[in-house]
Amino acid sequence: MNKPLIPFNHLNPFNHVNLFNFLNHFNHHKSMSKKVKYTILLFIMAIANFPALANDFVTVSQDGDFILRDKPYKYAGTNFWYGAILGSKGEGGDRERLSAELDSLQAIGIDNLRILAGGDGNHSIPSHIEPTLQTEPGVYNQDILEGLDYLIAELEKRDMRAVIYLNNAWEWSGGYGTYLEWTGHGEAPLPLRDGYENYMKYVSKFITDDKAKELYANHVRNMVTRVNSITGKPYSESPAIMSWQIANEPRCFDPANKEAFYNWLVDTGNLIKSLDPNHLVSTGSEGMWGCEGDIDLWARIHNSDAIDYANIHIWPYNWNWVKPESLAEDLPQAITNTKDYISSHRALTKKPLVLEEFGFPRENMEIAKGSSTASRDAYYEYVLNLMVNSNDLNGINFWGWGGNANPAHKTWQPGDPYTGDPAQEDQGLNSVFSSDRSTVD
């Protein structure tokens, strides 16, 4: 549900819904002359179009805290990769569902969403999401662009925040592989078809390919400098954006590329800052797991002035901390490993640290809605309590929100509802649905 109207003397109270209601009441005020009404109306509309105040943006304090409206900001959030698609009026769009999902999230205290700006490349590639945003270098699907505009406008209404990632090391949204295809490296392997080793060998070329990186830099320029077609405001002035993120789980995929990887992340961070001084910049890193096991490289990247805060991801099942047949029995070890992974990274930076991806399977690796989430619930509870009761974490985003979706197939097919699981994953595998009451209550 929407938050109550903010008092007039604190920030800008006139979001679209409240402004409409106010003007409707104002227009029927009979004791006021038309001239006075007109003057006040002009004043109100001017205020409504003021840029966001400086303290509407999330910043970082010298003490290593997020700050929002002059107060420390810690958050519990989720991953909502498909938000821009839902906001579209075209293929895949469902604005009614988007509004319902945002309201549901806000009602359970989730005010921070990590979202994909949009996918890259052509349609009809197995395990790729559809529709994509960037169909060719610098050529955009206007429906998805306007879907992102709509999503940002809806977040502004609800005083929610988004972390928007602009690239992906993995195949499901195009990312590295698509940029390499566009620069003459041949067809990108698909991990589920051709094996992860072949995929990683192929995409390791992105970090050292100047043409591919420049195509991506142009995409950054196009997105960060965009003007929202709904609000009329540049993205750089939207308080709904907490951070621009360089990529989802960026990796160099080859120890020989570590220095080039560092330089690319720093250069991209500086590029974003030159285009948008209002918003934070983050990497989207998994931590040492995404730096070829080199935690010092992770620290060097995140302590750079080009990066405002630090990211890590944790996947107990993917990282073989738990086995499918013994999730409950392996849970204590997963919690111990989680604590150690967080602590080892926390010790190497004074900047805010966000665990922006973590997931845990349902019992017996079930994917059906209604199946038990007992071990997942216990793991989530541990992570949430750690964030709330310690200084180890400044924010968390679980993966991912499935909300009201009813998966139609185990493997996603065009026309199926979007869940927290992208097209390369079993639908329901890591999704938290609205019906998972033991998780969301």
Report residues per predicted region:
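Bacterial N-terminal signal peptides that target proteins for export
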Residues: 29-40
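Active-site mouth of glycoside hydrolases
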Residues: 57-322, 328-352, 358-439
